[in-house]
Curated annotation (Swiss-Prot):
InterPro entries: CDP-OH_P_trans, CDP-OH_PTrfase_TM_dom, CDP_ALCOHOL_P_TRANSF_CS, CDP_diag_ino_3_P_euk. Its EC number is 2.7.8.11. It is an enzyme of class 2 (transferase). Mg(2+) 2 binds at residues 52, 73, 77. Its cofactor is Mg(2+); Mn(2+). This is Probable CDP-diacylglycerol--inositol 3-phosphatidyltransferase 2.
Length: 225
């Protein structure tokens, strides 16, 4: 008699993955009103971002960690940030600043994921063998990583909210906002600091991942007869 396969819950219906679908839906609604209602957009976008921590907690709590869930999580994060950066590039000048940030974000994370598969690691956050102390600190300390990630999103949301014209000079708006002594200026300063660290991490991540790819090519050539 053939051995019956155990009944298992479809990976697509894992609780953390359902949370991921909700994040996608929230982002779709948010970006549909990003120009007509910036306050609603900010609330929906930030709530979706906060749910990023919820799906990770659910995955560990219910033992529903999956490769699909990890990919869905990263793709949702990258696409959400990319869309917001594109919007900011239409509001602020020079727009190349935000397009460059978009390129760095996508390139660094894509290379990191690809190098993870090449090295046989199970997670792109496994950087114990990295020579960069800042890189190890970032992925080894959840609080520090959370601060940097939240800072990026908060900074981008603030920039969207304080823009009053269709085209703004980025430096003028940032300097003017920082000069005003207020809770907003303090939040902006804290966000800029965390954002700066995150961009440094992205550069280190891209270089480290590129080194892994190059090393893989060298080792493959040496194995050839």
């Amino acid at each position: 008699m053939a051995k019956q396969r155990p009944a298992t819950l479809s990976v697509y219906l894992y609780i953390p993955n359902i949370v991921g679908y909700m994040r996608v839906l929230l982002n779709c609604i948010a970006f549909s009103v990003c120009f007509s209602n910036k306050t609603l957009f900010s609330l929906l976008y930030f709530f979706s971002f906060c749910c990023d921590a919820v799906d990770g907690w659910c995955a560990r709590k219910f033992n529903q960690v999956s490769t699909f869930g990890a990919v869905l999580d990263m793709v949702t994060d990258r696409v959400s940030t990319a869309c917001l950066l594109v919007i900011l590039s239409q509001i602020y000048r020079p727009s190349l600043v935000f397009l460059s940030l978009l390129a760095l974000d996508i390139a660094s994370h894509w290379l990191q994921m690809y190098s993870t598969f090449l090295s046989g690691k199970t997670s792109h956050k496994d950087v114990k063998d990295s020579t960069s102390w800042l890189f190890r600190l970032y992925y080894g300390n959840r609080m520090f990583m959370g601060y940097c990630c939240v800072s990026c999103e908060v900074l981008y949301i603030i920039l969207l909210l304080i823009a009053t014209n269709q085209t703004e000079n980025l430096m003028n708006v940032v300097v003017k906002s920082l000069m005003q002594i207020s809770p907003l200026s303090l939040l902006l300063a804290l966000s800029i600091f965390g954002w700066s660290i995150k961009q440094i991490i992205n550069v280190i991540q891209m270089k480290t991942a590129a080194d892994v790819c190059v090393l893989y090519d060298i080792e493959k050539q040496h194995k050839k007869p």
